[in-house]
Amino acid sequence: MTEAIIEKKNHKKSINDHDKDGPRPYVCPICQRGFHRLEHQTRHIRTHTGERPHACDFPGCSKRFSRSDELTRHRRIHDSDKPKGKRGRKKKSETIAREKELELQRQKQRNANDSAAVDSAGGTSANVIEPNHKLLKSTNSIKQDGSTFTEPLKSLRSKPMFDLGSDESDECGIYSVPPIRSQNNSGNIDLLLNAAKFESDKASSSFKFIDKLPLTSSSSSPSLSFTSHSINNSSSGLLLPRPASRAKLSALSSLQRMTPLSQNSESYNHSQQNLVHLHHPAPNRPLTEFVDNEYISNGLPRTRSWTNLSEQQSPSGFSSSALNSRFSSSNSLNQLIDQHSRNSSTVSISTLLKQETVISQDEDMSTEDAYGRPLKKSKAIMPIMRPSSTMPPSSGSATEGEFYDELHSRLRSMDQLPVRNSKDEKDYYFQSHFSSLLCTPTHSPPPEGLLPSLNQNKPVQLPSLRSLDLLPPK
């Protein structure tokens, strides 16, 4: 059916071609198509048979073509550097192979040129190698000699000559490095080595000295002591080490800086005395006593506040440390008892409170300093008396006998703490007639009448499970 349709179409074409172009004597025996020339007929017949007699003669190429014009077109790909594919599109496989071949050829030419250049320059290269070795040896020797110059410089750079500080440290920044005159290389090296050695010794000694300093040395004008030390050592002309760390400032030092210095001579004498304090510190000297004595010895005015209570010795024989500990929040009744036991005189707690009020009134009266300037009044902080559940509401002050009775009772209760039963514990917590006003618990227990009776808290005896008639569940 299909063959009949194809024959009809070819017959119509042959008739139309014959009518247009003239006769077509060469007719295809398979499809009955006519051609004007014989080569056209043979080329057409090869499409039916699949014969390809025209083969490519390029080495490595196995392509064959049915027409000769196709073979000539294919040969242009091998001959030209930039081959053109069919219909203007490049074939990737052919272009890649061609590029590889071109690169191999170029690389071979380069290798040949390099080998020729090496052969021509072989005689001159041997003459150049020997002076190069000599130059390398000379540079190595120079580097070894130069290392002796750089090592002391590195040691100097590693140690800082000065520290950055605030305005307080700027006042005492007299540390300076003298200029090194470059006369001879050997002289400069010796000077640098001596300076580095001196600096290391000074730095180690300063570290040891600062570690041994007590707290009082840090609170006593560090800037003046450092300036005096630098003035004494400035004539030596050597490198001076900076102290390892700045002296720490406390609350007393801020009050100390508020007082002006009278004269330059007094400041110099004050710095010399501070230097003596730094070199010979007192081991067991309290902070407040050191500062107060320092101001008293130098004649410097100072504001009157709670910090200088050590100047006013109490008539009862209490020291300044005992009074200061009275106002600190962390001290308890036990510390006051220890201080009381160390002194020979026995004073009750009410006398201490009276002395405190007298001191506060004296301080309120002094509103001017030695220079006639008004001072800020410090408010006297009175202790708050809290009612105790274990103390009867008595209007009079606690006597000495009641104080010691309460102390002994508390010590006995602490000794009997492990063997105390529930009844003793109840009696201990509800001692409402033998205690003082000072020892007040933070949370007072409720009165004895509000608690349930002991009969309600007794455990109820229940029968054992085995004695009960229990049946298993059904």
From Swiss-Prot:
GO terms for molecular function: RNA polymerase II cis-regulatory region sequence-specific DNA binding; zinc ion binding. The lineage of its organism: Eukaryota, Fungi, Dikarya, Ascomycota, Saccharomycotina. The gene is MIG1. It comes from the Eukaryota. A zinc finger (C2H2-type) spans 26-48, 54-78. Residues 1-24, 45-131, 306-325, 360-401, 440-474 are annotated as: Disordered. Involved in glucose repression of glucose metabolism genes. It is found in: Nucleus. Residues 387-398 have a biased composition (Polar residues). This is Regulatory protein MIG1. Disulfide bonds: none annotated. Belongs to the creA/MIG C2H2-type zinc-finger protein family. Residues 1-23, 45-55, 66-83, 93-106 have a biased composition (Basic and acidic residues). GO terms for biological process: carbon catabolite repression of transcription from RNA polymerase II promoter by glucose.
